[in-house]
From Swiss-Prot:
Any one Gene Ontology cellular component term annotated for this protein: endoplasmic reticulum
Extent of the HEAT repeats: 64-101, 283-320, 321-355, 356-392, 394-430, 467-504
Entry-linked InterPro entries: ARM-like, ARM-type_fold, Clathrin/coatomer_adapt-like_N, Clathrin_app_Ig-like_sf, Coatomer/calthrin_app_sub_C, Coatomer_g_Cpla, Coatomer_gsu, Coatomer_gsu_app_Ig-like_dom
Role played: The coatomer is a cytosolic protein complex that binds to dilysine motifs and reversibly associates with Golgi non-clathrin-coated vesicles, which further mediate biosynthetic protein transport from the ER, via the Golgi up to the trans Golgi network. Coatomer complex is required for budding from Golgi membranes, and is essential for the retrograde Golgi-to-ER transport of dilysine-tagged proteins.
Pfam families for the chain: Adaptin_N, Coatomer_g_Cpla, COP-gamma_platf
GO terms, biological process: endoplasmic reticulum to Golgi vesicle-mediated transport; intra-Golgi vesicle-mediated transport; intracellular protein transport; organelle transport along microtubule; protein secretion
Major location (coarse): cytoplasm
Annotated protein name in UniProt: Coatomer subunit gamma-2
Family assignment from sequence similarity: Belongs to the COPG family.
Keyword Protein transport included in the entry's annotation: yes
Length: 873
């Protein structure tokens, strides 16, 4: 017997776990009792419990000791004690993968599986299937078939679930049990029917036609199990998504009919499936929303929670569809369950009118301190969405957020608030000073280094442009005096930006920099010394290059290049142009709030998609002399989705070459493709110099082939080209079941869509946080200006979107957002042209009958300016 502990022990935590200090060696020593005669079921049961506890705690058992314990345990089958026997089954399952010769218990388990004791049969089947491999499965196949159609539900369910696990190991054998599974699917028992449907689906899931037939059969005949109905809804929903069938499909009609089912679980599953369907209109959502509305007034808390949580998701995309539920949601604000109340309010914030915002904020503030951090983050996300919807309400939101910022809370909660305030500042320039003041107050007592450095970065970026920049200096310098090394270093960088932008503040900033040069940390001292020297030069170009805009290279790429440079000493200085550019600008601040689950911060910066491509291409000998990878495009589809071969292309741009990576998938199971390459015919002076074929392309296994193209040297302005593409390969027919190919093959080809190279393939986006400084830094030596009429464009928003996508450059200073009711706008774009040449574009837009655009281009290379203007023209 396990000693009963009193409540006091339980609360203190001492003694609440009788197995807390178990030692593996002692337990294995105790296991020798299994060999004693007569068997003591009670003691053996306790020892087996200890072994399972140790295994579940992750204790490592060596193969020898595990096998010895396993063999000793097999003697316990001589006992007729029911509890001990079932504990043996559990132990067999746990030790199946770490012991040798576990098949020794096969005969004992088979005997129990076919015996008269129903209480043994189900667990024996599960244990037997755990230790059975492909070679032994046929020996028990007859028993498994009988068990699947057994009249005892627990036996039938055990056989079905075990079969489901064995599908991964022996698909071909389990496939022969389909008839028995279909018979079990007509069982009156709800669990047997559910498990039978699950097995049937997993046997057929790779055959869309078979799944469709199965769905048609069960949707017409009906089911008794609500669990099976839920699975059927999920299968139908998945099939709808894969086939991109419209809402006129019989499958959608079936899901909609489940909204009228008698079982609440089925009704909710159907409503949830409709809500999560892509491209669902408000009209198609209406029946699902009506059902969820009814659930909002259910006496069951779980139903109310499910309904309001799902409505919350609907409100993100279709707020108008949820408006009809506002009254029910308002009733849930006072719900005794705080999670339900929070979700109700955040849903109302997404669907409510501008006039209801203040009232809702007041209601939230009354209980926000009582809810968990996870739900506080949900509230902050709703407020962030509301700020974008009703920008005029930013002051009310800002006050509410600042109060929340003062409350106690974890890192994720505080980060969500800080991100929300930053997004309000960026969306509403008039709220900048208020927001910065709240953030300054927060960093005075901030225990999170990540947040403090983020806010200091924002102060350095936005503070110098405010009417009174001097008031932020005190808050920043306080961090240098009081905080950790990382925060002090960030504060030094922020101070430098004030000195670089404001001549009046420069003397004061230089004095503070001198103090920072005496810091105990070398990172802080180095930064202070560096900025001190740059600021003393009083040159705007230097300030722009080294203080405002910083590096725009890939950090993992820079690390690798510097390491390579140190391994091979050279008299030449390190060339920054040898480092790949960052695909996502380092300085870009994303204010999207991350989910609460991601509380662990990455210790090392993960390599970007482009860094991975750089490594993959560098491993191919033919591409090793091309230099650093400049840019990789998004994949371009060259075939339709449902064709026999699926081909997509990724364009990799280098200084003087382009590599075209063709990712090919063979969707025919009766063919093996070999020596696969894509032949390219250019329309311009581009020259294909090498093909690297994919050696083999088996069914459903993607492979890559490459084409190397030289860019025209004699005409650097030739940035656009169209390639006609043909896939060529050797076909070998093969057996669809075994995949065994014929000895002989034949050559064949497949015409692909044309592939275009355009201006964005030669330009990498680079964010310039201070565009004005970058504009001055590049200078007007190669500045050119032209005016264009965009006759077909009707709005400034459309014009801005078209220019950005056409040039493939990075919008700066949030100039991609056009203010409301404006007839003119200025768009700032920045990028780096192939070869490492900075290029900046200023486009002045005016709206009249169409849109008139005055484009000014600056670059460090005249050819680049000509390329941009020629492409726009």
């Amino acid at each position: 017997m396990i000693k009963k502990f009193d409540k006091k022990d339980e609360e203190s935590g001492s003694g609440s776990n009788p197995f807390q200090n178990l030692e593996k060696s002692a337990v294995l020593q105790e296991a020798r009792i299994f060999n004693e005669t007569p068997i003591n079921p009670r003691r053996c049961l306790h020892i087996l419990t200890k072994i399972i506890y140790l295994l579940n705690q992750g204790e490592h058992f060596g193969t020898t000791e595990a096998t010895e314990a396993f063999f000793a345990m097999t003697r316990l089958f001589q006992s007729n004690d029911q509890t001990l026997r079932r504990m043996c089954y559990l132990t067999i399952k746990e030790m199946a993968n770490i012991s040798e010769d576990v098949i020794i218990v096969t005969s004992s388990l088979t005997k129990d599986m076919t015996g008269k004791e129903d209480v043994y049969r189900g667990p024996a089947i599960r244990a037997l299937c755990r230790i059975t491999d492909t070679t032994m499965l046929q020996a028990i196949e007859r028993y498994m078939k009988q068990a699947i159609v057994d009249k005892v539900p627990s036996v039938s369910s055990s056989a079905l679930v075990s079969s489901l696990h064995m599908v991964k190991m022996s698909y071909d054998v389990v496939k022969r049990w389909v008839n028995e599974a279909q018979e079990a699917a007509s069982s009156d028992n709800i669990m047997v029917q559910y498990h039978a449907l699950g097995l049937l689906y997993h046997l057929r899931k790779n055959d869309r036609l078979a799944v469709t037939k199965m769905l048609n059969k069960f949707t017409k005949s009906g089911l008794k199990s609500p669990f099976a109905y839920c699975m059927l809804i999920r299968i139908a929903s998945k099939l709808l998504d894969e086939t991109e069938a419209g809402h006129d499909s019989p499958l959608f009609d079936f899901i909609e009919s489940c909204l009228r089912n008698k079982n609440e679980m089925v009704v909710y599953e159907a409503a949830s499936a409709i809500v999560h369907m892509p491209n669902c209109t408000a009209r198609e959502l209406a029946p699902a929303v009506s059902v969820l509305q009814l659930f909002c007034s259910s006496p069951k808390a779980a139903l109310r929670y499910a309904a309001v949580r799902t409505l919350n998701k609907v409100a993100m995309k279709h707020p108008s569809a949820v408006t009809a539920c506002n009254l029910d949601l308002e009733n849930l604000i006072t719900d005794s369950n705080r999670s339900i109340a929070t979700l109700a309010i955040t849903t109302l914030l997404k669907t409510g009118s501008e006039s209801s915002v203040d009232r809702l904020m007041k209601q939230i503030s009354s209980f926000v301190s009582e809810i968990s951090d996870e739900f506080k983050v949900v509230v902050v996300q709703a407020i962030s969405a509301l700020c974008q919807k009703y920008p005029r309400k930013h002051s009310a939101m800002m006050n509410f957020l600042s109060n929340m910022l003062r409350d106690d809370g974890g890192f994720e909660y505080k980060r969500a608030i800080v991100d929300c305030i930053i997004s309000i500042i960026e969306e509403n320039p008039e709220s900048k000073e208020t927001g910065l003041a709240h953030l300054c107050e927060f960093i005075e007592d901030c225990e999170h280094t990540v947040l403090a450095t983020k806010i200091l970065h924002l102060l350095g970026k936005e503070g110098p442009r405010t009417p009174q920049p001097s008031k932020y200096i005190r808050f920043i310098f306080n961090r240098v005096v009081l905080e950790s090394e990382a925060v002090r270093a960030a504060a030094v960088s922020a101070l430098a930006k004030f000195g670089a932008q404001n001549d009046d503040l420069l003397p004061s900033v230089l004095v503070l920099m001198q103090r920072c040069m005496m810091d105990s940390d070398d990172e802080v001292r180095d930064r202070a010394t560096f900025y001190m020297n740059v600021l003393q030069q009083k040159q705007k170009a230097l300030n722009a290059a080294y203080i405002f805009n910083g590096l725009s290279v890939s950090i993992p790429g820079l690390e690798k290049s510097l390491h390579q440079y140190t391994l091979e000493p050279s008299e030449k200085p390190f060339d920054m142009k040898s480092v790949p550019l960052a695909t996502t600008p380092i300085t870009e601040q994303k204010t999207e709030i991350a989910p609460a689950a991601t509380s662990k911060l990455p210790e090392k910066l993960a390599p970007s998609r482009q860094d991975i491509y750089q490594e993959q291409l560098a491993a191919i000998p033919e591409f090793q002399g091309l230099g650093p990878l400049f840019k990789s495009s998004d994949p371009v589809q060259l075939t339709e989705a449902e064709t026999e071969y699926v081909v997509r292309c990724i364009k990799h741009t280098f200084a003087r070459h382009m590599v075209f990576q063709f990712d090919c998938t063979n969707t025919l199971n009766d063919q093996l493709l070999q020596k696969v390459l894509v032949q390219m015919e250019p329309s311009e002076a581009y020259e294909v110099i090498h093909y690297i074929p994919a050696p083999s392309l088996p069914y459903s296994q993607p492979g890559s082939c490459y084409s190397l193209v030289r860019l025209p040297d004699d005409d650097p302005t030739a940035v656009s080209c169209t390639f006609s593409c043909t896939m060529k390969y050797l076909v070998r027919d093969c057996d669809p079941n075994t995949g065994e190919p014929d000895d002989d093959g034949y050559d064949d080809e497949y015409v692909l869509e044309d592939l275009e190279v355009t201006v964005p393939d030669h330009i990498q986006k680079v964010l310039k946080p201070n565009f004005g400084a970058a504009w001055e830094e590049v200078g007007d030596e190669f500045e050119k200006e032209e005016t264009f009429a965009l006759a077909s464009v009707r709005t400034l928003d459309e014009a801005v979107g078209n220019i950005i996508s056409f040039l493939g450059m990075q919008p700066c200073e949030r100039s991609d957002k056009v203010p409301e009711n404006k007839n003119s706008h200025v768009l700032f774009l920045a990028g780096v042209f192939r070869g490492g040449h900075d290029v900046l574009v200023r486009a002045r837009l005016a709206l009249a009958d169409g849109v008139t655009m005055q484009v000014t281009v600056r670059s460090s290379e005249e050819t680049v300016v000509d390329v941009i203007l020629a492409s726009v023209g």
